[in-house]
Regions:
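Detector for repetitive beta-architecture
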Residues: 84, 116-118, 129, 144, ...
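Extracellular beta-strand-rich solenoid/capping regions of secreted or surface-exposed proteins
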Residues: 107, 111-115, 127-146, 154-197, ...
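Bacterial N-terminal signal peptides
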Residues: 16-27
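Predominantly extracellular beta-rich ligand-binding scaffolds that present long acidic/polar faces
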Residues: 129-131, 142, 340-346, 357-489
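Extracellular beta-strand/beta-solenoid scaffold signature
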Residues: 131-135, 158-165, 183-192, 208-217, ...
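Acidic Gly/Asp/Thr-rich repetitive segments characteristic of extracellular carbohydrate-active
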Residues: 89-131, 513-516
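Surface beta-loop-beta hairpin patches that serve as ligand-binding interfaces in beta-rich domains
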Residues: 59, 67-75, 464-521
Length: 521
């Protein structure tokens, strides 16, 4: 098995939306650049000091890529605030909130600030539960209320119940805080109710022992979690899961963008389904893009029963078997519906992308996996070593991915939780010690137009078969055998250029290329 080193992969976001069928008319396309990954430095905030490293660069491309949709961080606009409130450890809540007579507590300032105003929290430590709820005014889209930490302002656990920062009002911006949970079993930040336009940005959340650093629940709608460093949330008892971000049932339209989330005992992001504990409707409308996820005890992203999820342009790596997990990087299971996984870089794991498996109720439907780069997936330490695995699901589409340097590139139809119904697998570069391991439960499989390494084995119902036998039993008359010969930034070889079939994604040239990277734009 080959190992790839460095930043080889590319990221492109095609224009097609979540569609259960991708076989629409494709088109020639112009290319574009891709957004940077992970936390970007912002002066005078805790993320200004985050060490720069190559994993924050945009995923490399040999040329511009068609259909890019991932949204880059925008530069902070200059704002003229209508009033400034000042909070200081040396202040007094009886003051007028000016620089000369600052307030003592953040909560007092929260109760006073109005649309278009800013609360400047001076350097120091504030042991309080910050509640932006019935005590606070709502901002407006044109005049948000900003809660600004300055000089490393630090929030630690204070008296009261619930998360350390509780957001229940729309159009508030929480910016630039060190939120230190001090190993207590608490959420760092919670969003609930109508929080449209409310944002947690440019902050460092660390060292918690509760369910997550950030959570959305109780019909939380429209929250944005952007450009934060989230790390060190660990539980060592009970279910041992302490996640970076948990999106709970009834949440809607949540965005998780450009965060670094790592070294937690749970997942970087989990969309939690209601199965097993609730009759509430699932979360709907989750966007996870441009993040850097690595080194958790569990997964990078875990999508349970949630609807309308987009996971794109993320870099995810360093997930190996642990005492509580198998080393899967990205998991979509239970009754997830309409989930788009595109343009991600996934490497150094025990399994790259897994669809199906655990089941409670209907199987996953409308899952689209496209233009991902999955490589260096290993069975070391007891891992499975699978690039992409499809189990119980219906209509899963796997197109234009590059799967390289794996123990087994693709597994389908082994019956875990039920059949892999009507999967579509086209235009993929497939390389592994075992290229494809196909079980007996993949009714309606459409397999073709893939470039498959000649060095890999084929398995059918657990038995090694010849390539010709495999193609005959699967009806694959269009896949070709050839070395991937991947070049700089995972550019495909001539065997893959213009050799794909139109699956509804924009392309450049006479026909789509096979694999995740499109040349010629």
């Amino acid at each position: 098995m080959r190992n790839f080193k460095g930043n080889f992969l590319t990221l492109k976001t095609p224009v097609a939306a979540l569609a259960t069928s991708l076989f629409m008319l494709g088109s020639a396309a112009h290319g574009a650049s891709l957004p940077a990954i992970g936390v970007q430095p912002v002066p005078n905030t805790p993320v200004a000091a985050l060490p720069a490293h190559a994993d924050h660069a945009a995923i490399a491309t040999p040329s511009p890529q068609p259909g890019v949709q991932a949204t880059a961080l925008s530069a902070a606009a200059s704002t003229n605030y209508t009033r400034e409130w000042v909070v200081s450890p040396s202040g007094n809540d009886g003051g007028d909130g000016s620089a000369a007579q600052p307030l003592r507590t953040i909560n007092k300032a929260v109760s006073l600030a109005g649309p278009g105003e800013i609360i400047r929290v001076q350097p120091g430590t504030y042991a309080e539960r910050v509640v932006i709820g019935a005590n606070a005014k709502a901002g407006t889209p044109e005049a948000k209320i900003t809660l600004q930490g300055e000089g490393g302002a630090r929030i630690t656990p204070g008296p009261g119940t619930g998360g350390m920062v509780q957001v229940r009002r729309p159009n508030w911006v929480i910016d630039g805080f060190n939120i230190d949970v001090q190993r207590q079993p608490l959420f760092g930040v919670t969003f609930e109710g109508d929080v449209t336009g409310s944002m947690l940005v440019n902050s460092d959340l660390r060292d918690g022992g509760g369910g997550a650093a950030v959570t959305t629940f109780n019909k939380a709608t429209g929250a944005i979690i952007e450009n934060n460093h989230i790390h060190g949330f660990v539980k060592n008892s009970g279910n041992k899961d302490s996640h970076g971000v948990v999106v709970q049932p009834t949440s809607k339209d949540i965005t998780v963008r450009n965060n670094d989330i790592h070294d937690n005992s749970g997942d970087s992001v989990q969309c939690l389904g209601p199965e097993g504990f609730s009759s509430l409707p699932p979360a709907e409308g989750l966007l996870v893009e441009n993040n850097h996820f690595y080194g958790n005890r569990e997964n990078a992203v875990d999508i349970k029963t949630c609807y309308g999820v987009v996971i794109r342009n993320n870099r995810m790596h360093n997930f190996r078997p642990t005492s509580t997990a198998k080393g899967d990087v990205l998991v979509v299971h239970y009754s997830a519906s309409n989930v788009l996984v595109e343009d991600n870089e996934i490497y150094d794991g025990a399994k790259g992308i897994s669809v199906g498996g655990n089941r409670s109720g209907p199987m996953p439907t409308g899952i689209v996996v496209r233009r991902n780069r999955v490589y260096n997936i290993t069975n070391a330490g007891g891992g499975e070593g699978t690039g992409i695995r499809l189990e119980n699901s219906k209509g899963t589409v796997v197109v234009n991915n590059t799967i390289a340097a794996t123990t087994t590139a693709l597994i389908m139809g082994h019956g875990t939780g039920g059949p892999t119904q009507t999967p579509v697998v086209r235009n993929n570069i497939i390389e592994g010690t075992v290229s494809v391991d196909l079980g007996g439960q993949a009714p309606g499989l459409k397999l073709g137009n893939n470039l498959i390494s000649p060095s890999g084995q084929f398995k059918r119902n657990g038995v090694v078969v010849s390539p010709d036998q495999f193609k005959a039993t699967t009806g694959d008359a269009s896949s070709i055998s050839g070395p991937p010969s991947l070049g700089e930034a995972f550019s495909p070889s001539t065997d893959a250029v213009d050799k794909g079939v139109d699956v509804g994604l924009p392309f450049c040239g006479g026909a789509p290329d096979i694999g995740a990277v499109e040349l010629g734009c």
